């Protein structure tokens, strides 16, 4: 029988499993990622987030449709049958009263509200005497119940025709008739039927007008070995657990249609990646970085904590951390002119930094240093996540495998070398992954907020049962990693090296 793997046809026996089909297609996937199978389409009826409010006026029946943006607004609308239009002005229409004694809410005064917004107001501060208000123009509203609102999406012209006394007869959900794609999660050992379409990954085409945000997405993928972990899922979007990133610019603000990928550029969720499942209007806090070209159905069935394979077009073009020979091969692969500055073997910086800008300019300038000037380190991100994030931020390694440290002081006779940190950020570092009995030579650590010199970064040059890499006692020390290669080079440094730049390159592997 014939099935399809990521769009490609594959012939397999009748009793074949998902695993058999993947092997026949030459496709391998990690055991911990989610896979789906698309079975076809079916006609369905489903409720939407909109409610139809029916009003009676004489022999005529009027209909208004409100898109509900909060569950409590649905509960308010359920109380409307029997209520009447109590007043109309050139600015607003009020229906009620309605009893909302069972709802939790807060009230504010003088809140600016757009036209044709449905809100709840509490003019007497008595929840049994609340009113459902529809605005006709932008206006400041008094005694508004915050976070209980909706939008009039149909029947706006009728709002202006209401004169008072019209009665709400009933409220009903708006039902959509749609064609629904039948998709289900599967395991590698599940059986298949003829025509099944196996989806193993999501393919994203990057937008050329969001190079910085796209690089953040590419870095997140690279650090997670091509997999993204689902953080949150709603009917509107699926969000991805991000790598930390700061100071994202506003770029390529556009419509958030189904399949659009965005990165939040501000706020507490800065850096979070979103894939939209339903259309939404543009918002300045979201940069559109790409569009799902294949595999959107997989994101319709994932759950929080799932991992999905993701590929991008184009893939990341990052030279930092490569040898000069590797950099030349990469430049040739993508038809990019390579300009090498400096004497050495290891690329420690590149300009432009962003993949999309490199491909746009078809030229990249890289800075190289001798390999023996680059210290290789392993970071313990799982054991000390906040401290490792701090280290990457200080060294500018949030999106690159190579960073820079400046020597603060080097005393071989004291058994440590200390590098400059960021005192302001360091004061926010809580104790985590403190040493227990001893600190071995090569251990990398930072001073936490328990000590005056919070934020200093250090490497232990010899074992100690008393002091950490920055010379602090164990309660003031957060262990963040170890030196894998180059400890001898650090031992050669002394006070004449104060202020010198030391390059560090992260290697990932088993401890």
Swiss-Prot record:
InterPro entries: Cyclophilin-like_dom_sf, Methan_mark_3, PASTA_dom. It comes from the Archaea. Belongs to the UPF0288 family. This is UPF0288 protein MK0796. It comes from Methanopyrus kandleri (strain AV19 / DSM 6324 / JCM 9639 / NBRC 100938).
